[in-house]
Amino acid sequence: MDVSYLLDSLNDKQREAVAAPRSNLLVLAGAGSCKTRVLVHRIAWLMSVENCSPYSIMAVTFTNKAAAEMRHRIGQLMGTSQGGMWVGTFHGLAHRLLRAHHMDANLPQDFQILDSEDQLRLLKRLIKAMNLDEKQWPPRQAMWYINSQKDEGLRPHHIQSYGNPVEQTWQKVYQAYQEACDRAGLVDFAELLLRAHELWLNKPHILQHYRERFTNILVDEFQDTNNIQYAWIRLLAGDTGKVMIVGDDDQSIYGWRGAQVENIQRFLNDFPGAETIRLEQNYRSTSNILSAANALIENNNGRLGKKLWTDGADGEPISLYCAFNELDEARFVVNRIKTWQDNGGALAECAILYRSNAQSRVLEEALLQASMPYRIYGGMRFFERQEIKDALSYLRLIANRNDDAAFERVVNTPTRGIGDRTLDVVRQTSRDRQLTLWQACRELLQEKALAGRAASALQRFMELIDALAQETADMPLHVQTDRVIKDSGLRTMYEQEKGEKGQTRIENLEELVTATRQFSYNEEDEDLMPLQAFLSHAALEAGEGQADTWQDAVQLMTLHSAKGLEFPQVFIVGMEEGMFPSQMSLDEGGRLEEERRLAYVGVTRAMQKLTLTYAETRRLYGKEVYHRPSRFIGELPEECVEEVRLRATVSRPVSHQRMGTPMVENDSGYKLGQRVRHAKFGEGTIVNMEGSGEHSRLQVAFQGQGIKWLVAAYARLESV
């Protein structure tokens, strides 16, 4: 049989994985190693050479897009029908299983799937029915708790509360939620997998049927599986099924949502004798970029081990730029992209990656000022985000009580006991009397036309808005914004959201405070008060709209969103301690290695050109913060990195000290060797200077604080 069409396009290790005997197999697939091709060719090999029926094959991926691509590529390669083969996501395959056996799974034939929004709405209703205070028992936290328990395979009766009243209450919420779903014939996404797992445990004859059918199981992105997903695959395989898993322990970056990188090691323990094949040849990046990625990830412990390499060129060194602040960082990135475009490159070939969504605001503004179209991948523009629109609506209502849209958005956000029935009365009164909603509330309260509890809640809300308006009227804009976010209850509400999403919302609110501070410094309008001017600015920016999907545009995204993508030119911004690695990872033990894996993912997105940037000072939470450069910069080989200077580019030893040619004369008014005092760092000596005018920078050796580069215009140094 001629199998050249299956093997000729592959390298040696890929061929080894595709043509391996039918046995349990771990393929450690490095970034850019064409693992999808290997999976597709392996499936084709099983059918063509091993004579396996498509009916015996189950292939599991993590996204519907990946599943569709796999089906398409198998069809192209084989040219025959793959009828009977199951290819899909964990949730999709579990859904298919439950539809086929709904009675055995104790589900109605027409059971419906709850999306996240529906799940949240149901939990809000249940928490209210249980007479629980939403502020103390937030529905979003309840959703996180329930989904986390299901991902661990736990029902309410499995949970050990050990007399903990908080745990007991969440357990009751979970129980009430489960009963409500069962009555209505509803399943959420986490329930799909848990119910499918329980189906096999409780109905051995059904499990045996699928074990006999799916004797060839292939799972992609195995490092991203959680406990219930692993248990599902382990149960299906039994003692006779042949499992091929493809994964990369160095790219496990979803621990915050339950992914267990340890599942790769569990596979080796549970399937003794499983062969391991490493795909290390990279078809994406230059040799310099791969050398940096290898050196970075080697600082993690407990790796299964692999080293990426390429037949391609060495390529350019990685560029490293130290910005004065986040504004300078954004300008530098935009200027680099403009140069790329001027040299014939497409904007869509450039990606800006950041650790936190909050970092996008300054970048978005710089791109807008440069009239450069951009697209937020997998997310929304800064001023379109829920928490930002909530905060802006409070500010709008303070500026104008008759803003009905703002009133509607925040009257019950956070929840304050103003029900839909009360709001319907307010709306009807507004329509009948041709009043704004605020005016309608005033009249209804004066007329005592509302029920006692509703009237009290509405009265408190209006008093809150009036008090905020009066007490913050003379405050600087950023102080006013910070006060409104706190006193409105928004900050507390979002702090109660568990996990990465809640943290992101808080960071975005803090970035809004920073935005108002910078606006009050940089924007002047004689005809408007600062708050009104900023609200106009925010509305105009939100109205700009993202670039159309067909339009050539710069790509902005978080590092998590970038996984699986590649771009000719990549910028990773905010490479500072406390930013990346994040402060949360530094505060919580055991998370630093996942941050390093995230950095590794970011570095390996770059095909030709990679630029890393960090800022000496950055406005965070409305304050100027000094961060050290990220430890990840110091872990890169010095021969792979080149530091970008204002006037020249020089090779850089990789350390947190900066090298340069001393300038004896400088128009900043400072001199080499001069003793100075800084408000935060204390006394020090000027050891180097560069730039001129507003870009003049000083390198100062501080006692006990190390060497710092400071912008002369902002440093406020005193001579000693």
Q: What do the predicted segments below correspond to?
A:
Residues 31-39, 43, 272-275, 280-373, ...:
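Helicase P-loop NTPase motor core
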Residues 1, 240, 562-579, 584-585, ...:
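Structural signature of nuclease core domains in nucleic-acid processing machines
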Residues 28-30, 60, 322, 377:
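Residues at the beta-strand->loop junction immediately N-terminal to the Walker
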Residues 3, 8-19, 23-28, 38-39, ...:
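Conserved helicase NTPase motor core
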